[in-house]
């Protein structure tokens, strides 16, 4: 088999077409003479120039054109020039449309945008883990939003849930023995979300927690004095920061997260109006 000249054509980046082409060529034990990629092809002028070049060099065209009008024009032009052409997407899109009775979106680059969203989500999850429970106060400056609250207000699971939405979240525990990070006062208060809970619910949760680890009644963790002290510190800090505060009492993680997302959406809308 002689080394082929392959021209990859796409109305997006062309990465998919090139990857498939290289995979196919590997089955023949061949490295192509070259694979030349033409990306973001969306006009008759571009199509004619490309096909003419391929014809002169006795090459073949492999394409993943999504836009139907561009795809049809490329196929017809290649046939007119006698250029071999492989349409990777057309037959598949047509079959899927017939099978599922829905029209394709015809939006180039959707796989790439979905990949970017996936990697952003992974990065957000890693960020949440690295900045969990106040372990890295400097992360506050890089966070999209910061959750503050006393122990047992679901800061960690909420951080992970919001990270799945692609948000970079830091959570900071508010305890009497720990100094409040200076970074909290360096960011926009709109990026801070306080999580409060009723004294009765918190007492019950902490008592159940002590029982679950075999230490019922141990220490001051679930004592009225300790809980009153922590709640007072939180309320004072939230007031000083002038941040949004959400009551998580008797709420599931998903419910609280959705309320946070609604609040975040309101902030975005407000900024767009400015």
Swiss-Prot record:
Superkingdom in the source lineage: Bacteria
Broad class of enzyme this protein falls into: transferase
Catalytic activity: N(tele)-phospho-L-histidyl/L-threonyl-[pyruvate, phosphate dikinase] + ADP = N(tele)-phospho-L-histidyl/O-phospho-L-threonyl-[pyruvate, phosphate dikinase] + AMP + H(+); N(tele)-phospho-L-histidyl/O-phospho-L-threonyl-[pyruvate, phosphate dikinase] + phosphate + H(+) = N(tele)-phospho-L-histidyl/L-threonyl-[pyruvate, phosphate dikinase] + diphosphate
Alphabetical UniProt keywords: Kinase, Nucleotide-binding, Serine/threonine-protein kinase, Transferase
Listed InterPro entries: Kinase-pyrophosphorylase (IPR005177), PPDK_reg (IPR026565)
GO terms assigned for molecular function: ADP binding; ATP binding; phosphotransferase activity, phosphate group as acceptor; protein serine/threonine kinase activity
EC number: 2.7.11.32, 2.7.4.27
Binding residue positions for ADP: 149-156
Family note: Belongs to the pyruvate, phosphate/water dikinase regulatory protein family. PDRP subfamily.
Role this protein plays: Bifunctional serine/threonine kinase and phosphorylase involved in the regulation of the pyruvate, phosphate dikinase (PPDK) by catalyzing its phosphorylation/dephosphorylation.
Record protein name field: Putative pyruvate, phosphate dikinase regulatory protein 1
């Amino acid at each position: 088999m002689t080394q082929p000249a392959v021209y990859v054509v796409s109305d997006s980046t062309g990465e998919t077409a090139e990857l498939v082409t290289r995979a196919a060529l590997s089955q023949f034990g061949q490295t192509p003479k070259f694979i030349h990629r033409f990306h973001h092809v969306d006009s008759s002028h571009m199509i004619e120039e490309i096909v003419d070049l391929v014809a002169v060099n006795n090459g073949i065209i492999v394409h993943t054109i999504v836009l139907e009008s561009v795809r049809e024009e490329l196929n017809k032009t290649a046939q007119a020039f006698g250029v071999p052409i492989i349409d990777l997407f057309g037959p598949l899109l047509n079959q899927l449309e017939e099978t599922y009775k829905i029209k394709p979106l015809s939006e180039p680059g959707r796989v790439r945008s979905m990949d970017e969203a996936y990697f952003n989500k992974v990065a957000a999850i890693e960020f949440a883990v690295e900045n969990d429970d106040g372990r890295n106060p400097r992360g506050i400056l890089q966070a999209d939003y910061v959750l503050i609250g006393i122990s047992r207000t679901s800061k960690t699971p909420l951080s992970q849930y919001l990270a799945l939405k692609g948000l970079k979240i830091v959570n900071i525990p508010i305890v009497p023995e720990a100094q409040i990070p200076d970074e909290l006062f360096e960011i926009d208060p709109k990026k801070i979300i306080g999580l409060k809970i009723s004294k009765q619910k918190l007492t019950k949760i902490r008592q159940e927690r002590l029982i679950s680890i075999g230490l019922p009644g141990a220490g001051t963790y679930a004592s009225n004095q300790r809980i009153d002290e922590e709640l007072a510190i939180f309320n004072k800090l939230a007031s000083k920061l002038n941040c949004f505060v959400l009551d998580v009492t008797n709420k599931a993680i998903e419910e609280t997260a959705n309320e946070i997302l609604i609040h975040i959406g309101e902030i975005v809308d407000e900024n767009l109006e400015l």
